[in-house]
Amino acid sequence: KSLLIQGYNYTDDYIDSFTVDGQGGGNLYVSSPQSGGGGSVCCVSFNQGVPLPIKLKVRWMGAYCMEYETNMFGRTSAYRKGLWREAEALAVDLSQGKPRAMEVHIFPEGHVEAAITPGYSPPRMVLPRTEKYQRPGSPKTYPDCTDDQLQQATP
């Protein structure tokens, strides 16, 4: 059986991309009191006979730093570089026998929770969001990239 992937972003930053066991989950704006920040995308495999909870590997691009490049004319341009984070989550079954979605909840400190559900659930954290899809008071400036961050490959 295939389950829809539904993401919930409780961090202060836009998540450019996330995956669940290698399956693309799309992008996620910061959550609002009514929404997790993204829609549903297809799909992650689920075998109903497998013992639960299921261990999942979740990766997301949700941290950023500034990278600078100087061209041959001496002009320097700044670019926002996305940095990948990764966590394991144990997916629990909350579907009441009607599995339709795999929810992935990404919390500010990098903790991830997952659940198999019968459909869309309300966010687990109720956080404010501005009309520009940002957290109120969250600065949108990023630190300069370190050498290690500049070496991080983008999958």
Segments predicted by a language model, with ranges:
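Solvent-exposed loop and beta-edge segments used for protein-protein assembly and interaction
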Residues: 12, 50-52, 96
